[in-house]
Each structure stands twice: as C-alpha cells, then as structure tokens.
Amino acid sequence: ETSDELTGAVLAMRNSSIKVKVKTQGHLVDCCGTGGLGKSMMNVSTSAAFVAAAAEVKVAKHGNRTATGKSGSADLLEAANLNLSLKPDQVAKCIEEIGIGFIFAQNFHPGMKYVMPARKRTANKTIFNLLGPLTNPANAKRQSLGVYDSKWILPVAETLKNLGAHKACLLYTSPSPRDTRE
C-alpha cells in the first residue's frame, strides 16, 4: 500500500465512523499501534496513553481487541473492568473531565464487524492493521503511533501528513532485541 492508498482508505473509514466531538480538539493526542508483532509482545500504547493523561495531555485513546497478539487495548481495559460501551458523548466527557477516553473501535466503526472474523482467521497482516491507528473518530491531530514493521514508517508518516496531522511520533520495535529502531 502506498501513502495515497492508505490516505484514501483512512478517509473512507473516517467518513463512515461514529464521531467523538471533543471541545479540546486542538491538543488532542492518540497513542495507538498497529499490533501484529505476535503473541509474545505486550500492549504498550494503552499504558502510554494513561501516562500522557497523567501529565495533563488530553488523550482520545482509540483501540480494539487483539487480532494477532496477547492483548489489544480493549482486552487490557476490559481486564481492568472498565466499561467499553461508552457512547460518543460519554467518551468526550471522559476526555474533557479526566483527560482520557477510550474509543473502542468496534463501537465506532460499525462496518468493521464484517472484517474482524476474517482478520482473526488469517495469520497475515492486512491493511486493517495500518488503518486502525489512523482512523481515530475524535480526529486527534497529534499521534504516537507504533507500526509492526519498519517498512511502514515512511508511508504512515506521509499518510499522517496527508491527513493534516500537527505532530506525530512513529515507533517500531522489532521482535528481536538486536534489531530495535526508532
């Protein structure tokens, strides 16, 4: 996929998503990752989102259940007994009042319910691994985004630029400790 193809797919998903309207839009941040690193890797984007919120950054944490690993953001938050079924206005209120709100992807991207079963059946990574972190329904313009393979850093960076991101930090961690890059 090229950055132009990713941009088109992101815009299509964003246009059909249920929006979260946050008053503090200007400095809203999302910490999200593509997943797809395998079963031995842990979810760090959710912890990073809480650290950012503790530092008084407004966080619209967009995430889902795992498709290929041990824990997606939703799996982690569900294990902590948090309500994943918040409506858009409730998520916005959480962001505005406590600094963080969780946007459970399957509740805000209704069309994706047709894709998830196929994603779980395949061992291959798909374009949907890349689209998830780019389709935040609160339209966060600042993002910390992890990718499963370093080859996606430039196309995802170009896609974020195409989408009007104000600031972005792209991360890649290899499953092998000898091949870690930023």
Predicted segments with their positions:
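Acidic, glycine/proline-rich low-complexity segments that act as flexible tails and inter-domain linkers
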Residues: 1-39
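Phosphate/diphosphate-binding glycine-rich loops and adjacent basic-rich segments that engage nucleotide
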Residues: 90-147
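Short glycine/serine/threonine-rich phosphate/pyrophosphate-binding segments
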Residues: 37-49, 69-71, 112, 138, ...
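Single conserved hydrophobic/aromatic residue that forms the stacking wall/gate
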Residues: 172-182
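A glycine-rich phosphate/pyrophosphate-binding beta-strand-loop-alpha-helix module
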Residues: 42-98
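Gly/Ser/Thr-rich active-site loops/lids in small-molecule metabolic enzymes
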Residues: 145-159
